[in-house]
């Protein structure tokens, strides 16, 4: 770029040239109510009520309707400011693989109840009072086009439960043993990966390190409009935090064989169902690539697309050992992520994934 262009851009007189526009979907302010109730010790019932006047179809993936051991609740021990560490999985799914069996219809006035045992994904062996809540967004799907039409944000009541640790000591043990087993045997060269898979992973990590590095710089000194589009704020302290996370991800990605995260290519947790690209095992610093990962585009060219390197960013953002606190999955896909508020955005993995892509693709903030 010539000096004159630099000066004009800095002065705000010459707008940058963008590859395409970023377009956000609608955010519905009402229509679903979420309430939590205790059903005994570590078990919690979730009741989702459609308070609107028409039937809607909710995407199950990464929501309270997802049967996978994904993060659905925020849990604190009373008197502590530190969240109880999550021991389940964070999944990355392909938005192009939506199907009817991924939808949860709910009619007007209808309530759907789901029961979860918190001890299956949290270590609640210490007796006492715990505070449980849930927040996020429900992606609403157009059943004709199978695309996300809008999102409905939700925030549950705050529930206090009394836990007897002696009753739950064995609940997490089976899953924990699998985690420990994978953590001990999974590394870049010994995770049941073929030579082809190793080559794909190594290439994706190299690209990820560069993409995350660019995003780290952009978060601090790049176009503030693009940052605000994904993180809903221009607060300098938040920009610094986002930059620091990307910097940590970049460093981890360039340390494929010496980093804290290990790669596994065999799905011993049995969660690589259709549409699941990869998942992170929380507490074990293990990322598992599902078979579909190797058919995902290596390098995307669109502002709202994903690829192998962006999947790496998504999964590494979930690992506490890379950057604390780790992200979670509050929204699915770019459109739903851009409908989050500032507090949710900074905690949401896909907000980082698609911001990094927007920086790389030079996408235009709408």
From Swiss-Prot:
Primary location class: secreted
Subcellular location: Secreted
Catalytic reaction annotation: Preferential cleavage of bonds with hydrophobic residues in P1'. Also 3-Asn-|-Gln-4 and 8-Gly-|-Ser-9 bonds in insulin B chain
Gene3D superfamilies in the cross-refs: 2.60.40.2970, Collagenase (Catalytic Domain)
Major enzyme class: hydrolase
InterPro entries: Fungal_M35_metalloproteases, Lys_MEP, MetalloPept_cat_dom_sf, Peptidase_M35
Intrachain disulfide bonds: 272-290
Residues at the active site: 315
Sugar attachment sites: 123, 192
Ligand binding (Zn(2+)): 314, 318
GO BP terms in the entry: proteolysis
Signal peptide (UniProt feature, chain positions): 1-19
Listed cofactors: Zn(2+)
CDD domains: M35_deuterolysin_like (cd11008)
Prosegment location in residue numbers: 23-184
EC numbers: 3.4.24.39
An example molecular function term from Gene Ontology annotations: metalloendopeptidase activity
GO CC terms, sorted: extracellular region
Keywords, comma-separated and alphabetical: Cleavage on pair of basic residues, Disulfide bond, Glycoprotein, Hydrolase, Metal-binding, Metalloprotease, Protease, Secreted, Signal, Zinc, Zymogen
Cofactor descriptive note: Binds 1 zinc ion per subunit.
Reported function: Secreted metalloproteinase that allows assimilation of proteinaceous substrates. Shows high activities on basic nuclear substrates such as histone and protamine.
Family to which this protein belongs: Belongs to the peptidase M35 family.
PANTHER family, alphabetized: NEUTRAL PROTEASE 2-RELATED (PTHR37016:SF3), PTHR37016
Name this polypeptide is given: Neutral protease 2 homolog BDBG_02110
